[in-house]
Amino acid sequence: MKRLSVLCSLLLVAAALGTELPLATPCDEEACKLPDCRCSSTNIPGGLRARDTPQFVTVTFDDGINVINIETYREVLYGRSNSNRCPAGATFYVSHEYTNYQLVNELYNRGFEIALHSISHRTPQAFWADATYQNLVQEIGDQKRQMAHFASIPASAIKGVRIPFLQMSGNTSFQVMADFDLLYDCTWPTTALTNPGLWPYTLHHESIQDCIIPPCPTASIPGPWVLPMISWRDLNNFPCSMVDGCFFTPDRTDEEGWFKFILTNFERHYLGNRAPFGFFVHEWFISSNPAIKRAFVRFMDIINNLNDVFMVNSAEVIDWVKNPVPIDRYRQQQCKFTMPSICRPSFCGPLTGTHNQLSYYMTICNTCPRNYPWVGNPLGQ
Ligand SMILES: *[C@@H]1O[C@H](CO)[C@@H](O)[C@H](O)[C@H]1NC(C)=O
């Protein structure tokens, strides 16, 4: 099994090295049509009017899932529904180290989306900028299998990627995504295309998106979608990709100020071209700032009661863009269904990390591995 996967990786590398990727050419709307191709643009998919377009809100959290941060997720997310009575979504970009996979299984069974954020989340950031195809096969491609195995969830449910530090390596992560059947990337910030906002698109053709953290892809790579991280604006109009990265903000104890700050950013989308509105944040920022947590909860309480706003898993946004329907038809659709997936937990450890000789403990939904799973040995065999 391991030898087979090594062989597969080698074949993929050979395929990647053997052919230089074609440079993307300017997008031709006539040649690039939904559901599988979309030019990068701020046009609303399907030519809908803004008032007929569902305003999607994507709440996302990054990094490991553990017994501490799950408390916040349970408190602020569980039991929420949108106005169409479908459960509200959120997406977790999970890194492997110190993740408790029993809790990943719990989030999955609650209908939330589990996505990839690398096995190691290693520093320095330059590692990701310079990452080779093989590096990213081991960090992202292999993580899909690892996540499915330890959290006992279907590999087909794992669709999204966010690279650590929002640091892309040009074409490479998208090539890996195409080869490992991953649907979309949510790593690429835009500060230029925020009002009106950039809608998700594919990389068949040249992207019009500004490259904030180079290198960005320039090849034609059919397959994966880009779900742009549309920046917020702070109180001095400086852009920020992650909410916890905004600089000039209301005081962290000012609930009312934060509530208005969130709404102001939301309204740029809601009263504009309704490009998906992202609330991209780390759990520590919410749990260590109770006033911001209350403001965030108030914001969700409001949007969960608006008839044209839907807090969804990020992959659901891509599903809608591929097949855009107006709000009234969207509201009639059935809610997404998650087939329950049982976790029989094993508490494993101490397991030695063969890369650093540290002892690790893991809670997983499978039999315990021999070694601590890591880059190059994702199942810890
Ligand atoms: C991406 O691929 C294009 C086309 O082959 C190439 O010109 C470009 O240099 C590549 N980008 C990086 C960062 O390697």
From Swiss-Prot:
Catalytically driven reaction(s): [(1->4)-N-acetyl-beta-D-glucosaminyl](n) + n H2O = chitosan + n acetate
GO terms under cellular component: extracellular space
Location in the cell: Secreted
Cofactor: Zn(2+)
Class of the enzyme per the UniProt entry, highest EC level: hydrolase
Binding-site list for Zn(2+): D63, H117, H121
Domain of life of the organism encoding this protein: Eukaryota
Signal peptide range in chain numbering: 1-18
InterPro entries, A to Z: CE4, Glyco_hydro/deAcase_b/a-brl, NODB_dom
Regions crossing the membrane: none
UniProt keyword terms in alphabetical order: Carbohydrate metabolism, Chitin degradation, Disulfide bond, Glycoprotein, Hydrolase, Metal-binding, Polysaccharide degradation, Secreted, Signal, Zinc
Inducing factors: Strongly down-regulated in response to 20-hydroxyecdysone (20E). Up-regulated in response to juvenile hormone analog.
Biological process (GO), any one: chitin catabolic process
Gene Ontology MF: a single term: zinc ion binding
Gene3D superfamilies documented for this protein: Glycoside hydrolase/deacetylase
One Pfam short name: Polysacc_deac_1
Function: Hydrolyzes the N-acetamido groups of N-acetyl-D-glucosamine (GlcNAc) residues in chitin. Shows activity towards the chitinous oligomers GlcNAc(3), GlcNAc(4), GlcNAc(5) and GlcNAc(6), but not GlcNAc or GlcNAc(2). Requires the substrate to occupy subsites 0, +1, and +2 for optimum catalysis.
Protein name (database record): Chitin deacetylase 8
Lineage: Eukaryota, Metazoa, Ecdysozoa, Arthropoda, Hexapoda
Annotated gene: CDA8
